[in-house]
């Protein structure tokens, strides 16, 4: 009988293939005294140049495969390799102690790694991994060591590793890489996000999978359930070969839903839309058959720049998107702060940055920055269907202030004779419990709501979703959260306003029947999830989903809801 191991289901898909175990190179970096300081600095500079060349090449590969948003990760990596403060410290150490370049770089980068990895802010935790990735690349070049090039894999394998860096994941070719398993990581890590974009099955957080598996072992994985199977017998192999074939056939069957409307079995119409963060991602929306864009994350225009983008730069980007999409495109205004930083603007240190000066709180305070964005969005509305929504709204006064500011920008454009859609919809994110509880009052002023479940879960359960010690509190099917969603939807519908959802929950097959039953109007998800969601929706009767929703609202625990949903899905025709 096979041995089963459970990890974090990070990217769906079923695979059966031989393992390729990639162990992290253990660099034996010894402190050595050197006589030629200048030569050592030259070695460092040459290694940095080679590393930047590597990263630019990987960035171009990523740009072609996955678009601008994912490729932007390597801008950050190049910034680290080029960081003058880090280089200055390394050079100073070489000069002062007359030590070898690799030892000096390892010492300095390790100090930064330790400092950042101990911080609570997920942004800095992520940066610590980036620093480690880049510094090891530079050190490898100093030592003349071969760097693993995963793009050269030319046979079907499942990669086993402690972790996969963004630069490694970007090189994977799904023709040969049938999946990957790692000791660490979770659904929101770079590796998981890349895997979903590449449509490569992945299970993370397996703790010691590199010790349990050897290269060439035959293994199976189910990226939907998070199950890995080892020590397969003949029956197990046949079973998984059948599962793989069924999965391939299912993906082929889903293609017929591309040009179909999103309907329940009893012909109730809903919308299934896509989330994107870059103008380069528009093609994936068109290919997916999504009925619009429920979330365009505008902050990537800011994060990929070395300055606040001008009104004209933003206008061109927004216009490019709405002119290609025939359905509504909802733009979230600048959601910066918390885990999202800008290289050219320093936020003050805060005890709780996720609860601090961010999103709408920042833009209402910095109306000079906000004005460029609102004017650009209004101007773009003349070229397609466009909605504007404000993030992190906590009070009605905040929403009124933001909406009034839009009206002031309209008056300016009128005076200048610049065209825009005067009926552009103005909505808000519901990601703070106060907004959900008072949704019926907010609905008097907002044209629509979009529920951001990632933050709503985090704020409802007072738990950092990036902190593994409290990850058990990430409970999207907890009845308390479902009641907040129900309050939001009923409050909006009371005033004939529509409600969408743009968090990960919108694309979750377990959540979909409940959200249908709660009468959610629009489901916005990653483009790769659209057809699967539309297919599932077509099998569900709205009347039965409403009965399910009423039952789960009376539950006490996440587990009880899970059981009801599993029974419901298992009984679909």
Curated annotation (Swiss-Prot):
- Alphabetical list of InterPro entries matching this protein: PEP-util_enz_mobile_dom (IPR008279), PEP-utilizing_PTS_enzyme (IPR050499), PEP_util_AS (IPR018274), PEP_util_C (IPR000121), PEP_util_CS (IPR023151), Phosphohistidine_dom_sf (IPR036637), PTS_EI (IPR024692), PTS_EI-like (IPR006318)
Q: Where does phosphoenolpyruvate bind?
A: 297, 332, 454-455, 465
Could you cite one Gene Ontology molecular function of this protein?
kinase activity
One annotated GO biological process: phosphoenolpyruvate-dependent sugar phosphotransferase system
Q: Where is the active site?
A: 190 (tele-phosphohistidine intermediate), 502 (proton donor)
**What Gene3D superfamilies would the database entry show?**
Phosphoenolpyruvate-binding domains, Phosphohistidine domain, PtsI, HPr-binding domain
How is the activity of this protein regulated?
Irreversibly inhibited the sulfhydryl reagent N-ethylmaleimide (NEM).
Q: What is its EC number?
A: 2.7.3.9
- Residue numbers binding Mg(2+): 431, 455
The record's subcellular location field reads: Cytoplasm
Q: Principal localization?
A: cytoplasm
> What role is this protein assigned?
General (non sugar-specific) component of the phosphoenolpyruvate-dependent sugar phosphotransferase system (sugar PTS). This major carbohydrate active-transport system catalyzes the phosphorylation of incoming sugar substrates concomitantly with their translocation across the cell membrane. Enzyme I transfers the phosphoryl group from phosphoenolpyruvate (PEP) to the phosphoryl carrier protein (HPr).
Give the free-text miscellaneous remark of the entry. Answer: The reaction takes place in three steps, mediated by a phosphocarrier histidine residue located on the surface of the central domain. The two first partial reactions are catalyzed at an active site located on the N-terminal domain, and the third partial reaction is catalyzed at an active site located on the C-terminal domain. For catalytic turnover, the central domain swivels from the concave surface of the N-terminal domain to that of the C-terminal domain.
Q: What is known of its domains?
A: The N-terminal domain contains the HPr binding site, the central domain the pyrophosphate/phosphate carrier histidine, and the C-terminal domain the pyruvate binding site.
> This protein is called what?
Phosphoenolpyruvate-protein phosphotransferase
């Amino acid at each position: 009988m096979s041995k089963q191991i459970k990890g974090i289901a990070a990217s769906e898909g079923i695979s059966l293939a031989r393992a390729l175990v990639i162990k992290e190179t253990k660099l034996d970096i010894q402190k050595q005294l050197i006589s030629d300081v200048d030569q050592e600095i030259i070695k460092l500079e040459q290694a940095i140049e080679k590393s930047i060349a590597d990263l630019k090449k990987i960035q171009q590969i990523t740009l072609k495969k996955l678009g601008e948003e994912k490729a932007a990760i390597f801008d950050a990596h190049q910034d680290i390799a080029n960081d003058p403060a880090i280089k200055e410290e390394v050079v100073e150490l070489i000069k002062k102690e007359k030590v070898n370049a690799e030892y000096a770089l390892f010492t300095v980068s390790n100090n930064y790694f330790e400092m950042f990895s101990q911080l609570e802010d997920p942004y800095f935790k992520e940066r610590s991994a980036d620093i480690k990735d880049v510094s090891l690349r530079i050190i490898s070049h100093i030592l003349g060591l071969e760097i693993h090039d995963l793009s050269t894999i030319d046979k079907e394998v499942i990669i086993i590793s402690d972790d996969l860096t963004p630069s490694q994941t970007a090189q994977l070719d799904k023709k040969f890489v049938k999946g990957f398993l790692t000791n660490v990581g979770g659904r929101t890590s770079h590796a998981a996000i890349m895997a979903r974009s590449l449509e490569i099955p992945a299970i993370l957080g397996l703790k010691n999978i590199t010790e349990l598996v050897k290269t060439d072992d035959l293994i199976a994985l189910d990226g939907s359930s998070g199950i890995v199977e080892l020590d397969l017998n003949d029956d197990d192999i046949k079973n998984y070969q059948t599962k793989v074939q069924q999965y391939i056939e299912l993906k082929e069957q889903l293609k017929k839903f591309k040009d179909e409307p999103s309907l329940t079995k009893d012909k109730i119409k809903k919308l299934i839309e896509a989330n994107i963060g870059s103008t380069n991602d528009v093609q994936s929306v068109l290919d997916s058959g999504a009925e619009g864009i429920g979330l365009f994350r505008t902050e990537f225009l800011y994060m990929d720049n070395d300055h606040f983008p001008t009104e004209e730069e933003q206008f061109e980007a927004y216009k490019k998107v709405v002119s290609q999409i025939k359905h509504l495109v909802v733009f979230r205004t600048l959601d910066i702060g918390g885990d999202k930083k800008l290289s050219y603007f320093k936020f003050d240190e805060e005890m709780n940055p996720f609860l601090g000066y961010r999103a709408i709180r920042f833009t209402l305070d910095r109306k000079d920055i906000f004005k460029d964005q609102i004017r650009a969005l209004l101007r773009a509305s003349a070229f397609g269907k466009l909605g504007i929504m404000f993030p992190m709204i906590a009070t009605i006064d905040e929403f009124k202030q933001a909406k009034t500011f839009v009206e002031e920008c309209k008056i300016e454009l009128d005076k200048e004779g610049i065209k825009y859609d005067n009926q552009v919809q103005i909505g808000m994110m519901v990601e703070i419990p106060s907004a959900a509880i008072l949704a019926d009052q907010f609905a008097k002023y907002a044209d629509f709501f979009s529920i951001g479940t990632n933050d709503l879960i985090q704020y409802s359960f007072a738990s950092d979703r990036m902190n593994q010690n409290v990850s058990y509190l990430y409970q999207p099917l907890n009845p308390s959260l479902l009641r907040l969603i129900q309050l939001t939807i009923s409050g909006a519908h009371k005033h004939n306003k529509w409600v969408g959802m743009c968090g990960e929950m919108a694309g979750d097959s377990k959540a979909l029947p409940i959200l249908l039953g709660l009468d959610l109007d629009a489901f916005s998800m990653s483009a790769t999830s659209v057809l699967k969601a539309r297919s599932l929706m077509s099998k569900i009767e709205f009347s039965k989903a409403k009965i399910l929703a009423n039952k789960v609202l009376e539950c006490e625990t996440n587990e009880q809801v899970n059981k009801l949903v599993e029974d419901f899905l298992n009984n679909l025709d």
